[in-house]
Amino acid sequence: MFILEAELPSAITAFAEKFSDILRRRKVLFGSDPFVGVKILRKILIARLDQVLLNLILRLREVYVMRGLREEQLAIAIADAAGPLRSCAATLLELEGQKENSPKAALEKYVKSTGESAWLEALPRISEAREQRILPPGVAGAVLLNLIDVAKSIGSRLEKLREAEC
């Protein structure tokens, strides 16, 4: 990302979930940290997280419908969705006052908290899809549907958080 310092306030508001992830994981290699003191308004972060989740759900559903018979393409979609889904889980946990060392750990913690065994079984497949860009025959469709369900579940928990704040 190549962004001017003057553009930061607008960009942070427009892409609150993305910048939340940047704030969590940034490492300054040279010079001063342009994000020192940056705070994202909670209500903006909640609204943007809701948008990101809805977009992810819609995109994954479209992939499933349009390319569901092509498992190699589903595996790529799973790999591509892993980062945003993990980041969404990390943001939700952060909004709930919990911290995790990585977005991957945040997603695992979230899934464990739901008690959904199918989702827990899907987690290693997500990593496998990211690393190998392919999954064993007959697996990708179920994993992708599980990702949609996880994203919907994160959205439901986010909605409860929003309601609790009103």
What residue spans do the PLM features occupy?
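Conserved nucleotidyltransferase catalytic core and NTase-mimicking acidic/glycine-rich helix/loop elements
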Residues: 39-166
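Conserved catalytic core of two-metal-ion nucleotidyltransferases
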Residues: 1-30, 37
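Short amphipathic alpha-helical segments with coiled-coil-like heptad repeat character
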Residues: 30-32, 92-93
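Short acidic (Asp/Glu) and glycine-rich catalytic loops that position anionic groups and cofactors
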Residues: 1-2, 32, 85-88
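Alpha-helix capping at helix-to-loop junctions
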Residues: 17, 24-31, 55-62, 66
